């Protein structure tokens, strides 16, 4: 469980930046330093690597649960299929059909869909909490690799398949699938490292293990373009004296063909510029809602 210790006076804290105070746990401080500097995941000890991966999986798990709960609440009392499927990508339905065929191997779906009596009977079977809950768990695990067990109250909802479709099209769903599929692959390590960085600092802030001063959010909002987590990591590196440890140097060809426009934030480590074409395409797919099934 993600218990907060922000208000616990017994937890000692140390200043880790101009805008941050972190609990004085040696392991947390050691991982935070490596995460802020963008060191390769191979530089982490096995103990540290297990902790980082466990936290990422935990956050994905809780995030998917929260998103499904939100969509279920939004769909309460709605019976219009056009409204229910407005945020459901088209590739979701073939995947759901294959999942239903595996759940009901002896059922003639073509006959059940066009016969009201059989359709009503199938709907009653799908409303059974154990059956629908297992269907949800298998679908999410098949596409993300995460064994998420949803509460029976969610599985009992009549619009749960539409809520699941919205979850399928969400970027967090694709990010979880990307993380579990490419964890440990050297070609994707720079991208997995960026995910671990953001997840780690989100976990520290969310659980109260790192306290951020209120003025940090005001300064970040007006002067920073890459988000609060990158802002906190830069502040962490500045305080530790490692901000320029890996300066970003553009390629000479990029300097010759430079076009005016807003600067793109560099990745956190020089190795991130050596991504394979497959890794680049996979990263771009994370930003395309219609390509959720391709991640």
Curated annotation (Swiss-Prot):
Q: Keywords of this protein's UniProt record, alphabetized?
A: Host nucleus
Compositional bias of type Basic residues: which residue ranges?
245-261
Protein's cellular compartments: Host nucleus
Identify the domain of life: Viruses
Q: What does this protein do?
A: Plays a role in the expression of late transcripts bridging viral DNA replication and late gene expression during infection. Functions concordantly with UL87 to initiate transcription from over half of all active viral promoters in late infection, without affecting host transcription. Acts on and binds to viral early-late and late kinetic-class promoters.
Per the record, the similarity remark reads: Belongs to the herpesviridae UL79 family.
**Protein known as:** Protein UL79
Task: Name the source organism.
Answer: Human cytomegalovirus (strain AD169) (HHV-5)
What gene is this protein translated from? UL79
